[in-house]
UniProtKB/Swiss-Prot annotation:
The gene is htpX. This is Protease HtpX homolog. It is a multi-pass membrane protein. Keywords: Cell inner membrane, Cell membrane, Hydrolase, Membrane, Metal-binding, Metalloprotease, Protease, Transmembrane, Transmembrane helix, Zinc. One of its GO terms (cellular component) is plasma membrane. GO terms for molecular function: metalloendopeptidase activity; zinc ion binding.
């Protein structure tokens, strides 16, 4: 199976997960609206709320809050991702070291190969661990960050494959997707938890009581459901980025070697006390946690090895 077909299949999976998120998000808001209007019949109330015969106030507020939070995150996300470490912008208009010139040159080669008309900002993070991540809401404010240890220990092709992987995340809008899903998840959990307690003591009609019971069940189920969906979504995007890197490189071997070196580095060293920025853990090229949003290195390498260019 070629890489373009793999990417297309994973996009379909992503759309299915994102649709599921939006449906659950709206359903929770509608349930709270059913309780708010003290409905006698759950089905009839949901129909009237969905068709705006009754205005779904809580549902609309939830979507507005999500929108505001997303806007705030867009403005500050890159600075949050870079926080906690000393970092340097590779500015081609200034004098660069030979290594910085090489990294910038690799990025330009990939941009030409992919026929892209934008250039992400390139950062070096001064850190002893080997990793990389991409950030930015869209192409115009995107960035790619590489740790100094990664730059020192990978050869030219491996480094280019890592940059290609992060560039693929930007091309596939993965950062935007991850941010939106994370925000929707948190708002869903907050509304499901607090609405149950807020309405618990009030006398309600049968439809409202049924909505309350469903919310009580969701209060237990949602944390596990959102975790599973987020892990599935993120792992799908990682496979896509790996495929995108191999496609741009016309070879999967450099990406495989890079993953092996990074994995071995984390096996030999414990960086938990050094790398304290938890916000960017989901965006890393490699995540060593047991319940990681990333597939295992073994599965990623097997997936890359099976695929034909």
């Amino acid at each position: 199976m070629n890489f373009e077909k793999i990417i297309a299949q994973n996009k379909l999976k992503t759309n299915a997960v994102l649709t599921t998120y939006c449906v659950i998000f709206a359903f929770i808001g509608l349930l709270v609206d059913v309780i708010r209007i003290n409905a006698n019949d759950l089905g009839i109330a949901l129909f009237k709320l969905i068709t705006f015969q009754i205005f779904p106030t809580i549902t609309v507020i939830m979507f507005l809050v999500a929108f505001v939070v997303i806007v705030v995150c867009i403005q500050n996300f890159s600075s949050i991702m870079l926080s906690g470490d000393e970092y340097k912008l590779i500015d081609p208009s200034k004098v660069l070291s030979s290594k910085e010139n090489q990294i910038h040159g690799l990025l330009l080669e990939l941009l030409e190969e992919a026929k892209l008309n934008f250039e992400p900002k390139l950062y070096i993070i001064n850190a002893p661990y080997m990793n990389a991540f991409a950030s930015g809401w869209n192409e115009t404010n995107s960035l790619i960050a590489l740790t100094s240890a990664l730059i020192e220990r990978l050869d030219r092709d491996e480094l280019k494959a890592v940059i290609a992987h992060e560039l693929s995340h930007i091309r596939h809008n993965d950062i935007r997707l991850t941010m939106c899903v994370g925000i929707l998840s948190n708002i869903m959990l907050l509304v499901a938890n607090f609405s149950v307690y807020f309405f618990m003591g009030n006398r309600k009609n049968s439809g409202a009581n049924l909505a309350k019971m469903i919310l009580l069940v969701l209060q237990i189920v949602l944390p596990f459901l959102t975790l599973i969906l987020q892990m599935y979504l993120s792992r799908t995007r990682e496979y896509m980025a790996d495929s995108g890197a191999a496609f741009l490189m016309h070879d999967s071997k450099p990406m495989i070697r890079a993953l092996q070196k990074i994995s071995n580095d984390y096996k030999e060293n414990d960086y938990k006390e050094i790398d304290t920025n938890s916000t960017r853990s989901a965006a890393y090229l490699f995540n060593a946690e047991m319940f990681s949003t990333h597939p295992s290195i073994k599965n990623r390498i097997q997936s890359l090895s099976r695929r034909a260019l």
